[in-house]
Amino acid sequence: MTRLAPVARLTQYAHGAGCASKIPPAELERVVAGLTGGGDDLVAGGADGDDAAVLRIEGGRAVVSTADFSTPVVDDAYDWGRVAAANALSDVYAIGGEPLMALNLLGWPRDLLPAELAREVLRGGRDVAALAGCAIAGGHSVDDPEPKYGMAVTGVADPDRLLRLDAGRPGVPLSLTKPLGVGVLNARHKATGQVFPQAVETMTALNADAGLAALERGIVCATDVTGFGLLGHLYKLARASGVTAVVDASAVRYLDGARTAVRHGFVPGGTRRNLSWVSPHTEFRRIAEEERLLLADAQISGGLLIAGEIPGAPVIGELVARGRRTLVVR
């Protein structure tokens, strides 16, 4: 099917780009403090901030539920739909589940952008959901000053074989399945219109195989790297697990052009807020500011951060016994 010819730069209709528009993590934690909870059958999704909620049901199974939506990260409507869908589905894979059904979540400025463009966004989401074997069963839409799109996803999992945020143990290596840098590249794209195909490719890639590989190897701890950056999500994992996480900065992969984007000042506000949040909990050993920003870069549809090793994913550090700081970057 031929794509709709662009009539507008979608990123110009949003104040921020994708997951970089998240409410700052420290502020969000204050807002939701004491408001989460559930019965004994809610085995994930409580105060630790797991990637998805998991509810145990009969027959040794569990229902997985999550929702994610964002503002545009790219100007191409179809690609934005693909990115947003992959990002929403990722939370199911990150906790060890299989997505079954999704509902579209769409906010659209009807007086500013044509309905045909919204259709392209939905088509992109549909195509990625189809790759995941996930049915789309309608959804919800609102007239919104800013375009927003994402999905509420329902899946299934074995409640006794989950990838949990709080299951990290000392002596386990850390692996990361995708390169970092989409946040700063998306910021450059928003400012200049320059397209970064490698960034689009990594953002639209599903984390299905990585999640399955982790389960097959008996791994029990993982999360995905999205709006809070590598350091933010690793901090949450290490804090929940009661360990210290050590990152070997030289082992972390970055997309082509990411360092240049930082040097030219294309750093999202969300990335800077991430770094401010984790810095008091992090021991940086001779790590330059540029490197710190990249490690905290706000991602969308990032890779899985796994406490363990799977084929094709570089080891970027390890978990050790809890020390003075929750994170160490060397």
For the regions a protein language model found, what residue spans apply to each?
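N-terminal glycine-rich phosphate/pyrophosphate-binding loops that anchor nucleotide-derived ligands
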Residues: T2-A94, C134, R169-S175, P314, ...
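Acidic-glycine-rich active-site phosphate/pyrophosphate-binding loop
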Residues: A53-S65, T204-A210, L275-R285
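Short beta-strand-to-turn element immediately C-terminal to the catalytic PLP-Schiff-base lysine
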Residues: L55-R56, T154, T177, A307-G308, ...
